[in-house]
Regions:
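Alpha-helical rod/repeat scaffolding segments in eukaryotic adaptors/tethers
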Residues: 21-33, 54, 58, 99-106, ...
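Amphipathic protein-protein interaction modules
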Residues: 69-121
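Short amphipathic alpha-helical segments and their helix-coil junctions
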Residues: 14-30, 65-69, 87-101
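Helix-rich alpha-solenoid scaffolding regions
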Residues: 52-66
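Generic helix N-cap/helix-start motif at coil->alpha-helix transitions
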Residues: 1-5
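Glycine-rich, aromatic-bearing surface loops/beta-hairpins
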Residues: 118-148
């Protein structure tokens, strides 16, 4: 279910199809927020590693955010730069301090993570499914290793 919902959300974002995007991200937001964040974060991290094998500079992170916001604004004017920053930062392992409230909802994550994924896929001329499959495999392996 998560795989299909995320694939639909990313495909709608790539196509700039507002109606399909809203439907897909509403479905994605109805799923377990921790799992959605884990999977989409793993996809984002892999994409960033592939597209920037020597690491990301601050300017490159800013370029991703600006490019993503600029492209999405035309068909999704609700795009929130703060949510993009938090999604991208989370994928890179940068999280708000635990004493600070997280200023985004699970719906914000469900909407903004696919926007960033779609932007990176388009920029790198990549397909979503291989990244999703690899992320799901890594997560399943990590969970299996955590079992007693």
């Amino acid at each position: 279910m998560l795989a299909d919902c995320s694939a639909s959300a990313v495909a709608a974002a790539v196509a700039a199809n507002r109606e399909e995007f809203l439907l897909a991200t509403d479905r994605l937001a109805s799923l377990d927020a921790e799992q959605v964040g884990l999977v989409l974060g793993a996809v984002l991290r892999s994409l960033l590693e592939d597209l920037h094998p020597d690491g990301l500079t601050g300017d490159e992170v800013q370029d991703v955010i600006v490019r993503c916001r600029t492209q999405a604004t035309g068909w999704f004017p609700e795009v929130d730069v703060n949510a993009l920053v938090l999604v991208l930062g989370g994928a890179l392992g940068v999280h708000p301090h635990e004493d600070e409230p997280v200023p985004v909802t699970s719906l914000d994550v469900a909407r903004h993570a696919p926007l960033v994924v779609a932007d990176l896929l388009t920029a790198g001329d990549r397909s979503y499914r291989p990244y999703l499959d690899a992320a799901l495999t890594r997560i399943a392996e990590a969970e299996a290793n955590d079992l007693p």
